[in-house]
Amino acid sequence: VDLCIVLAGPTCGRTMAEFGADVIKIDSPHVPKVLRHNDTNRGKRSVLIDLKTKEGLELFWKIVESADVVLQNFREGVAEKLGVGYEQVRARRPDIVYGSVNTYGHLGSFAGRPGHEPIGQAVAGMQVRLGSKKPTTAPFSANDYGTGLLACYGVALALLHRRRTGEGQ
């Protein structure tokens, strides 16, 4: 179940779909259409669900009943506010593998800040090292693609752990 938007999170789900997973992309009616239907969603089935409604949450839980993985890339605290955070999902599905991707991680002084590739490049100092006289953004999203691939790797390892122990992560 893929709740992700933009690039890093959806890249994880797309890679899983390319390797044969049945990925259900849950799109939000609150997200601009341009962010819902791009290259990173190929190979996925898609459904439009408003997680901010009771009916939407009921549909989410119905889908999660038979899922192996839930992916999200919300800003810190947003998944919990929507009722789809790790502990909330784990309470219903203790064996679930829950992948969470964001720009700054879940710990540290930047946790909870919104961000995506260009912001991450600026904070990391990458924009001043690209050879231009003025800070510039790299012409490709190496960090987002790399993050998505590493998230996929982490999900695969968590699935292997679950297969061996029965425990979700």
Tell what function each PLM region has.
Residues 1-31:
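Conserved small-residue-rich beta-alpha loop and adjacent elements
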Residues 15, 19, 82-169:
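Active-site-adjacent "lid/gating" segments in soluble enzymes
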Residues 9, 78-80, 106:
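Short glycine-rich, flexible loops that bind phosphorylated cofactors or substrates
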Residues 5, 52, 140-144:
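Alpha-helix N-cap/helix-initiation motif
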Residues 36-41:
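Active-site-proximal loop->helix
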Residues 24, 47, 97-99:
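Hydrophobic/aromatic beta-strand patches that form the interior of the parallel beta-sheet core
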Residues 1, 43-92:
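A structured beta-alpha segment of the ubiquitous adenosine-cofactor-binding alpha/beta core
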Residues 5, 51, 75-76, 102-103, ...:
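Short glycine-/small-residue-rich Rossmann-like dinucleotide-binding loops
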